[in-house]
From Swiss-Prot:
It comes from Arabidopsis thaliana. The gene is AUXI1. One of its GO terms (biological process) is negative regulation of clathrin-dependent endocytosis. Residues 839-904 form the J domain. Residues 619-640 form the R domain. Residues 456-663, 762-804 form a coiled coil. Residues 46-99, 150-731, 749-776 are annotated as: Disordered. This is Auxilin-related protein 1. Residues 370-383 have a biased composition (Pro residues). The lineage of its organism: Eukaryota, Viridiplantae, Streptophyta, Embryophyta, Tracheophyta. It comes from the Eukaryota. Residues 232-244 have a biased composition (Acidic residues). GO terms for cellular component: cell plate; cytoplasmic vesicle; cytosol; endoplasmic reticulum; Golgi apparatus; plasma membrane. Gene3D superfamilies: DnaJ domain. Disulfide bonds: none annotated. The keyword Transferase does not apply.
Length: 904
């Protein structure tokens, strides 16, 4: 059942003892909220505790020992009316009075001040079920559990009398512990300070003094008169100057112990009379009693005889209200005093600069939570600049506002312990040690409550910081005024004040030094934490960068893989398409080749048939032609022989007739010239030699004509004289011819008839010119005759060679052309088989000769390659010339047939 304590208490209303408690009423929303918080942390009540008030959230029929549901702000018992027993309640008391929440009840026997109404709350401790937090009670009439802010409106003496901690119900045994109450009473300190320093303090506890100092104070008691009225309101921010003006004794090492003892500071002046902000406390009107109560239940006016060094604060004289408000600079002045300074108690208040705070400006965040406390402390408070007088030494005060408590903190009775430091220690949630030296018990529920209280304290601290900044200016001004007033009324207390001032300053310097060290440590820790956070941030950034880089690499790899896959897919597709195309092309080529092969086979078969037929026909024709040629040759030979014989006979007859005519003419002429002069006779003889001759005839003109292959008629025509000659030339020529003929007949030498003859009477120049012309003529004639003879011999030799080569080449050419007569495509496609390699012919496939245009183009190329003239120009031999002539003749014949059969 121990594990289900909170569960049963929260869900079923059962306490750990097994009793059933009725659920709280839900009519009030505020009460329901507090009941929810109280029910989640249900603890057992302490034995022997009696509640004088009827709790709002508990069963009215149950006594104080059986309370189960507590409010976290467990209020004090309601005020007693009419009797000291406190059994009756005011019928007009509200169920949840916020104004009375921050007030502290006063019993009739302890105070003569009017009693204020209190809200009806459960007065049991929230944490009472924890054994370590059970605190024995010293008075049955005092409230066991009071309001969490009861110290705001209650006096320390009241707490000392009741021996109850204001925060027992909030923080348990650790913060509201009463184990050292006797020691605190002996030291004259308040049992516990308020949660917010300065709230609810009506009197300052006395400082720890010797008997002599107490005696001096008693002797100087007449200086003090009656205190201010009992309803004087206290300044809640007096701690701002008290924490600076009071010395501190580092007797406690537990920083959280200070939080539960906020009213344990010892000062020389009352919080009502010594605070700077005495007239601007926004919470003073919340029902706080005016008069200060000591531990003996005395009235606010304390006579000198009742002053003790352990309990009573120094008696204040009239007019000491401003005298105790000493600024922080005054505490640092180096002068000694043996007696405390007089205080002002004239009861006057400065209302010209009143600044009021409302409850809404101090939010309280105390909602229940199960979250762990914060892992890091709140941000440090900003240091406040401290004004320094002209003559006071420079003391380091930068560490005054520290958030890290040290082991040398002031004890409960130390008047110099800063209440703001206690609040700081409480806000950061540090572990503290109880007054008896034992550590506080820790559990999950304590951590939750502790975190909520820390959050509330932090919120209040923030509000106090804002108010402190708002009131700093007024504080400094009033400090100066109060200092002047206090110094004017110091009188005989100068020595005691100087000694106490020196002591306070020394302690303050020591505490400031310690605080500076703590701040330095705190700064170092913060720097280390900051460095760790920066390193962690850098590490996280590096990891993020690595993650981003890895993601980028993965994305790039994925994209590369996708691109590679796409490229591979495209390549495969292209390969497939290429293969399909190649296959289709191969199929087409194969089909074309098959068609061509079939065409070639058909063409070859047809060509073979045609070739066979043509060969047979050719053989027949050749045989016929050979027979006819032979017959014609025989006939021609016979005719030629007959013609030669006839020509010879005619020549002989003509020669005989010519000789006879020449002889007859010679005789007749001789007879006629006998009568002429001899000169004329010789001149007529020599004239033909000088006359131009048409041709040079050989000895036998008929024989010469025959040798040249000419006929008899051509020789006769050559002897004729052109018709355009004059008559005398004709006669001369005839005479010359006759003479030549006679000379040739009679064996005259050709040199005499063809040689150069001198002419009488011609000049030397003409003779030389005629001689040169005669020589050139002879040379040209001889050269032309030699060339003609050479050509004739060459033609004869070539013809003989052709006849010899034709015997072998004709067979090859006929074999090549067999079956291809008239088929130009077949001849052109097989032309490389008959031509010689040096001709430059490139073989042509039959598939390239399908169209007529391609056939014509290839034929033109073949013509340029094997034309006889082209072949002779290239310097071909006789065999190549013969082949070219034969092939060209066959191609030309086939071309003529191709043109006649096909259209372009």
């Amino acid at each position: 059942m121990d594990d289900f304590t909170g569960l049963l208490a929260r869900d079923f209303g059962l306490k750990p003892q097994g009793k059933s408690a009725p659920m709280a009423s839900q009519s009030n929303s505020s009460a329901a909220d507090f009941n929810t918080f109280a029910s989640s942390y249900s603890f057992a009540t302490a034995a022997g505790k009696k509640s004088d008030s009827l709790p709002v959230f508990d069963d009215p029929g149950r006594d104080g020992d059986d309370l189960l549901f507590k409010d976290v702000f467990s209020g004090p018992p309601p005020p007693k009316y009419g009797s000291s027993s406190g059994d009756s309640r005011s019928p007009s008391a509200p169920a949840f009075d916020y104004d009375a929440m921050f007030k502290e009840p006063k019993s009739k026997s302890a105070s003569s001040m009017p009693v204020y109404d209190k809200p009806v709350y459960d007065d049991e401790d929230v944490f009472e079920s924890i054994p370590e937090l059970k605190i024995p009670s010293t008075s049955s009439q005092s409230a066991r559990f009071e309001n969490v802010f009861s110290s705001i409106s209650s006096s320390p003496t009241k707490h000392r009398k009741q021996n109850s901690s204001p925060f027992d119900d909030l923080m348990g045994n650790n913060l509201g512990k009463k184990g050292a109450d006797s020691d605190r009473e002996e030291k004259g300190s308040s049992i516990f300070d308020d949660l917010i320093p300065g709230f609810g303090r009506t009197s300052s506890p006395p400082s720890k003094r010797t008997t002599s100092e107490t005696t001096n104070q008693s002797e100087k008691a007449p200086y003090r008169t009656a205190e201010t009225s009992s309803n004087v309101e206290e300044d809640p921010f007096v701690v701002l100057e008290e924490s600076e003006s009071t010395p501190r004794e580092p007797s406690r090492t537990d920083p959280l112990d200070d939080i539960g003892k906020f009213n344990s500071r010892k000062t020389d002046h009352s919080s009502v009379h010594g605070g700077v902000f005495v007239d601007i406390d926004p919470l003073d009107n919340l029902g706080k009693p005016g008069p200060d109560m000591n531990s003996k239940g005395k009235s606010h006016l304390r006579p000198p005889g009742n002053i003790s060094g352990s309990q009573s604060p120094p008696v204040e004289s009239p007019g000491s209200y401003h005298s105790k408000k000493v600024s922080f600079e005054d505490f640092l002045e180096p002068h000694n005093m043996s007696t405390p300074p007089p205080t002002n108690s004239n009861g006057s208040f400065e209302s010209s600069d009143d600044v009021w705070l409302t409850v809404s400006e101090i939010p309280l965040f105390t909602q229940p939570t199960s979250a762990p406390p914060p892992t890091r402390p709140p941000p440090p408070r900003p240091t406040r600049p401290i004004k320094k007088k002209v003559n006071e030494p420079s003391i380091p005060t930068s560490a005054y506002h520290s958030h890290v408590p040290s082991s040398g903190r002031a004890s409960v009775n130390s008047p110099t312990a800063s209440q703001m430091d206690e609040l700081d220690d409480f806000s950061i949630g540090r572990n503290q040690t109880a007054a008896n030296g034992y550590p506080d018990p820790s559990s999950g529920e304590d951590s939750d409550v502790f975190s909520t209280a820390a959050a509330s304290a932090a919120a209040m601290k923030d509000a106090m910081d804002k108010a402190e900044a708002k009131f700093r200016h007024a504080k400094e001004r009033r400090e100066k005024e109060n200092l002047k007033a206090s110094r004017s009324r110091e009188g005989d207390h100068t020595e005691n004040y100087d000694s106490r001032e020196r002591e306070l300053r020394e302690k303050q310097v020591r505490l400031d030094r310690e605080r500076a060290e703590r701040e330095a440590e705190m700064e170092k820790a913060q720097e280390r934490e900051k460095e760790e956070r920066e390193r962690e941030q850098k590490r996280i950034e590096r990891e993020r960068e690595r993650l981003v880089a890895r993601q980028a690499v993965e994305r790039a790899t994925r994209e590369a893989r996708e691109r590679a896959a796409t490229e591979a897919h495209a390549k495969v597709q292209r390969a497939a398409v290429g293969k399909a195309t190649d296959a289709r092309e191969r199929a087409e080529r194969a089909a074309v080749q098959r068609a061509h092969a079939e065409a070639r086979e058909r063409a070859a078969a047809g060509a073979r048939d045609k070739a066979a037929k043509a060969a047979a026909e050719a053989r027949e024709k050749a045989e016929k032609a050979a027979a006819e040629a032979k017959e014609r040759a025989n006939a021609e030979a016979r005719e030629k022989e007959t013609r030669v014989r006839a020509e010879r006979a005619a020549v002989e007859r003509a020669a005989a007739e010519a000789r006879g005519r020449a002889a007859a003419q010679a005789k007749a002429k001789q007879q006629q010239e006998n009568t002429n002069d001899l000169d004329s006779f010789f001149s007529s003889i020599s004239r033909p030699n000088s006359a131009p001759r048409q041709r040079t005839n050989p000895l036998d003109p008929f024989q010469d004509s025959w040798n040249k292959g000419g006929s008899f008629e051509s020789s006769r025509e050559s002897l004729r004289v052109p018709p355009g000659q004059p008559e005398n030339l004709r006669k001369t020529s005839s005479v010359t011819n006759i003479v030549d003929d006679l000379s040739s007949i009679f064996g005259a030498s050709a040199s005499q008839s063809g040689g150069f003859q001198d002419v009488d009477g011609e000049t030397e120049e003409r003779r030389r010119a005629r001689l040169e012309r005669h020589q050139r003529t002879q040379e040209r004639a001889a050269k032309a005759l030699a060339e003609k003879n050479e050509r004739d011999l060459q033609v004869q030799r070539e013809q003989v060679e052709k006849d010899r080569i034709g015997v072998t080449l004709d067979v090859e050419i006929k074999r090549w052309g067999a079956g291809k007569e008239g088929n130009l495509r077949a001849l052109l496609s097989t032309l490389q088989y008959v031509l010689w390699p040096e001709c430059g012919w490139q073989p042509v496939s039959l598939t390239d000769l399908i169209t007529a245009a391609s056939v014509k183009k290839v034929y033109r190329k073949a013509t340029l390659c094997i034309h006889p003239d082209k072949v002779q120009q290239k310097g071909a031999n006789l065999q190549q010339k013969y082949i070219a002539e034969k092939v060209f003749d066959m191609l030309k014949e086939a071309w003529n047939k191709f043109n006649s059969e096909e259209l372009f």
